[in-house]
Amino acid sequence: LGIAERCIEIMCEYSMKHRDAFSKKLSEFGQIQRLIADSYTEWSAARSLVYSVASGINPENRNSLGAASAKLAATRMAENVSRNAIQVLGGYGYCREYPAERLHRDAILLSIGGGTNEAMMKNIVSDLRRIYGV
């Protein structure tokens, strides 16, 4: 969640305060607005899911289905949002002087560490098979 939140901050700062194109702030262009709005919406939804699942976990209720679903959703979201940040920054998105490229690399790592996204999907289906008696 933190990677995506920082990417949203970077997109807003850059497009609303620092970058002009054709005598307008970058954030006044529809495609940039869509990237920022989509990023915030994805982040907000993933945050709600993660917090909801985390608040219900205790020693008696591990909720592995919820945990795997939340990790999968959050890592996918972080990759999408960090990719959007690179898009908003354009060529600067690839430069090491801007943090977007590092954040994107870190977001990709999230889908590997702590259980790959593929492992999370396998766990989700395994839990659903158990729930539905298959």
Where are these regions (language model features)?
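Alpha-helical interface subdomain recognition
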Residues: 1-134
